């Protein structure tokens, strides 16, 4: 089993518990926004990520930082959840837990998550057209795009929906041609 699969197995019960708590508190949308904010903060601050993932830093210090950073910024349920993760020494799985949480919520709401890798930022018109195309392909009510800029793709884009990948990038085509030429020679 890959380490990513192992982490996903550990993260899933936490994500399920958070979905259940958020749903019973009628706060799914608020929790979604708060977790997206936290995920964005962690992605932008490598120091904060390293701090939370460092096992040598005591749980009390981590709890104090969570309280000072997020009190009055995010829903109290999110703060309590983060404190539980710190107590159980699972805060290092926060990225995976957030990802699993969002997957579960989107399943509840019949939303498809499409990860889009592109060399440049897509315009609103392009995003809208892509969303409509993905809705048609997946028969879903709504589509959530997670866009990542990857300049190495040169042109085109890669779309990942679940286990399905659609690669229309120039990088992917060149890689395919290279593999073909290596197999022939």
From Swiss-Prot:
GO terms for cellular component: chloroplast thylakoid membrane; proton-transporting ATP synthase complex. One of its GO terms (molecular function) is proton-transporting ATP synthase activity, rotational mechanism. Keywords: ATP synthesis, CF(1), Chloroplast, Hydrogen ion transport, Ion transport, Membrane, Plastid, Thylakoid, Transport. It comes from the Eukaryota. It is a peripheral membrane protein. Its main location: plastid. SUPFAM superfamilies: N-terminal domain of the delta subunit of the F1F0-ATP synthase. It is found in: Plastid, Chloroplast thylakoid membrane. Gene3D superfamilies: N-terminal domain of the delta subunit of the F1F0-ATP synthase. F-type ATPases have 2 components, F(1) - the catalytic core - and F(0) - the membrane proton channel. F(1) has five subunits: alpha(3), beta(3), gamma(1), delta(1), epsilon(1). CF(0) has four main subunits: a(1), b(1), b'(1) and c(10-14). The alpha and beta chains form an alternating ring which encloses part of the gamma chain. F(1) is attached to F(0) by a central stalk formed by the gamma and epsilon chains, while a peripheral stalk is formed by the delta, b and b' chains. Belongs to the ATPase delta chain family. F(1)F(0) ATP synthase produces ATP from ADP in the presence of a proton or sodium gradient. F-type ATPases consist of two structural domains, F(1) containing the extramembraneous catalytic core and F(0) containing the membrane proton channel, linked together by a central stalk and a peripheral stalk. During catalysis, ATP synthesis in the catalytic domain of F(1) is coupled via a rotary mechanism of the central stalk subunits to proton translocation. This protein is part of the stalk that links CF(0) to CF(1). It either transmits conformational changes from CF(0) to CF(1) or is implicated in proton conduction. This is ATP synthase subunit delta, chloroplastic. It comes from Gracilaria tenuistipitata var. liui.
